[in-house]
Amino acid sequence: LLRFGDSGFPRQQLQFAVNEMKFPNANDGKLLQPGEWYHVAVTYDTETKAAIMYVDGKEQSRIDDYGNGEAINLGKQKKGDFMFKIGHSYGDPDDMSRQLNGEICEVRIWNVLRSQEEIYRNMYDVDPQTTGLKAYWKFNEGKGNNIAKDLTGNGNDAVAYTTAIWPEGIEVPQKNKE
């Protein structure tokens, strides 16, 4: 679960949680500012059990010996199942108190460990056929469609639980261009 804040955490701090394990600890120096676009990536090494959070292609937080990673089920799920969600925290999908108050441009799911260099280089663009890329949603489908197509061709299309809102005219600043 990648989320903003929690009980005892600043509201603008990203936090990664698996079961009862959370990282990083509360830290006002790691706040994300409202109204700004950020590229966020989290990697998990199944061999070393290390999890790393990157913000704008730079390592922001790291934790070693972070539990036992399990595969994410991207398949269509029934209400009541542990569900993979984008823009909504855990719990019942009808509970709108746990949804993200913000916008998401893209989401990618990999089954290979990405290096900091790869994350930085591909912050804004990646070939959908790249080895290990299991799902890739751009969230630019347009009006009236509640399905975000999986660009990898793996069939992991994302279906909105409620009516999708497709903002227009979003320009995401490319922070990795020198």
PLM region descriptions:
Residues L1-N156, Y161-E178:
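Extracellular glycan-associated modules
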